[in-house]
Amino acid sequence: MRLLVIECATECCSVALFEQDRLLGGTAQVLGRGHAEALVPMIAALPGKGQAERIAVSLGPGSFTGLRVGLAAARALALAWRADLLGYPTLALVAAMACAEASSRTDKAPVSVAMSGGHGEWFLGEFGPDGAALAPPKSLTPAAAAQAARADLVAGSQAAALVAARGFGQALTILPDARQLLLLDPALLSQVVQLHYGRAPDARLPGGTLLSDTLFDGAWPGTPQ
């Protein structure tokens, strides 16, 4: 059974095609912007044009636009191919990648994940040595994130900045990569495919209802409730 993975939560857009535990093909591009234009050609360049029985897409937290682009493509392909649609938490993939890299050089250790967020904030997640989330991710100012980060090992796009801000620790600059999905605990692949932006949009619907109230249900895949 083939699995197509779509990762658009950050400035790095990546895709991968697996058959069981074997990577058939994949690519990653650091774009900043332009995920919508790049994603479909990247999928089409995969073996068999990326067609698969299952599709996994990054659910965030991350870029509003990138997450929506990834999910829209995943839903369209799942409908066209009659494929199963799954989602996974972005920061958990970064943590899994960091744990794999760190364990090759030292004993397993907890990891804090710090990624670029919106409005100058950072997404911060805390993970155990096995990559399991210890709490839901938060969107914090850089100063607050530096204070809140628990682990000596910090991974993500803002890892170096966080380590510099607090004055200690080891930084692994990592962006989520679809080609590394098999590092993630399979239990984190969820059939509940709902985006988690990590912070509430600064907008209200007519009548004053916060847009965030329509986007969040408080449940983060793989995190304690």
Give the ranges of each region predicted by the language model.
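Short, conserved beta-strand segments within well-ordered enzyme catalytic domains
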Residues: 16, 28, 54-58
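Phosphate/pyrophosphate-binding loops at sites that engage ATP/ADP/AMP, CoA/4′-phosphopantetheine
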Residues: 43-54, 103, 147-152
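Short glycine-rich phosphate-binding loop at a beta-alpha junction
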Residues: 51-60, 152-160
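Short, well-ordered alpha-helices that flank and scaffold nucleotide-derived cofactor binding pockets
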Residues: 41-45, 75, 79, 100-101
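DPxDG-like acidic metal-binding loop motif
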Residues: 56-85, 90
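A short glycine/serine-rich beta->alpha loop
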Residues: 26-31, 59-63
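Oxyanion-binding and handling regions
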Residues: 1-23, 30-37, 86-225
